[in-house]
Curated annotation (Swiss-Prot):
GO terms for cellular component: peroxisome. It is an enzyme of class 1 (oxidoreductase). GO terms for molecular function: oxidoreductase activity. InterPro entries: NAD(P)-bd_dom_sf, SDR_fam, TR. Keywords: NADP, Oxidoreductase. Belongs to the short-chain dehydrogenases/reductases (SDR) family. SDR65C subfamily. Gene3D superfamilies: NAD(P)-binding Rossmann-like Domain (3.40.50.720). It comes from Arabidopsis thaliana. Its EC number is 1.1.1.-. This is Tropinone reductase homolog At2g29330.
Length: 260
């Protein structure tokens, strides 16, 4: 295989990788030959996934971690440093969650929870990963953002601002860390068929609106996000950095349409 299209011999850390988009990303990266460490807050889901990946012959290890907790993030990176001998090629900041409320109904705890989970975790893990990414000689950071960080989603103002911040962080790190051989990009999905999105997608009215606003007429699948993440990590994508790329079925480019 052309080395441009292989991750053989490369190492990766995927946060929140035991389910949903993260799970699909692990499978995609492992399929290209990467050796991966996964962290997840759920011990049960993590163990189930690790067993599944072992049967598939993937090189995946894992540890339980609440990525919103600073001390647990530091412990995670100590583990990754040991496992990968001080070098890391790929960091996928995938952990994220949502709470939907009108803006005037959000409370301080909601703000703190969403900021620490969606934004602070990715920022701090990027800081902690920097020496490992630099040491690898070829570092790639991918932030899992959202279309909500680009266009307005009702009742999700805090979620949207955390995702918009990730898009900007990707731009900043792409410029600041390029000299260290590190690329950074953000991937911004539409609603994807995961457990997190299930309550929304099971609502017939919501689905009708989503389909009408999305040119491709449907929610996305986790593997459709994972395929882009994997591409951005490949040597073939070596000149792509600082970008926010939407995987949204056309949602963010859909304008106004009227047909009398």
């Amino acid at each position: 295989m052309d080395k441009r299209w292989s991750l053989q011999g490369l190492t990766a850390l995927v946060t929140g990788g035991a389910s949903g988009i993260g799970h699909a990303i692990v499978e995609e990266l492992a399929g290209f030959g990467a050796k991966i460490h996964v962290c997840d807050i759920s011990k049960t889901l993590l163990n189930q996934s690790l067993s599944e990946w072992e049967k598939k012959g993937f090189q995946v290890s894992g540890s339980v971690c609440d990525a919103s907790n600073r001390l647990e993030r530091e412990t995670l990176m100590q583990t990754v440093t040991t496992i990968f001998d001080g070098k890391l090629n790929i960091l996928v900041n995938n952990v994220g969650t949502i709470r939907t409320k009108p803006t005037i109904e959000y409370e301080a705890e909601d703000f703190s929870f969403l900021i620490s989970t969606n934004l602070e975790s990715a920022y701090h893990l990027s800081q902690l990963s920097h020496p490992l990414l630099k040491a690898s000689g070829n570092g790639i950071i991918t932030f899992i953002s959202s279309a909500a960080g680009i266009v307005s989603f009702d009742a999700a103002s805090i979620y949207g601002l955390t995702k918009g911040a990730l898009n900007q962080l990707a731009r900043n790190l792409a410029c600041e860390w390029a000299k260290d051989g590190i690329r950074a990009n953000a991937v911004a999905p539409n609603f994807i068929t995961t457990a997190l999105a299930k309550p929304f997608l099971e609502d017939a009215g919501f689905n009708e609106i989503l389909s009408s606003r999305t040119p491709l007429g449907r929610a996305g699948e986790p593997r459709e996000v994972a395929s882009l993440v994997a591409f951005l990590c490949l040597p073939a994508a070596s000149y792509i950095t600082g970008q926010t790329i939407c995987v949204d079925g056309g949602l963010t480019v859909n304008g106004f349409s009227y047909q009398p």
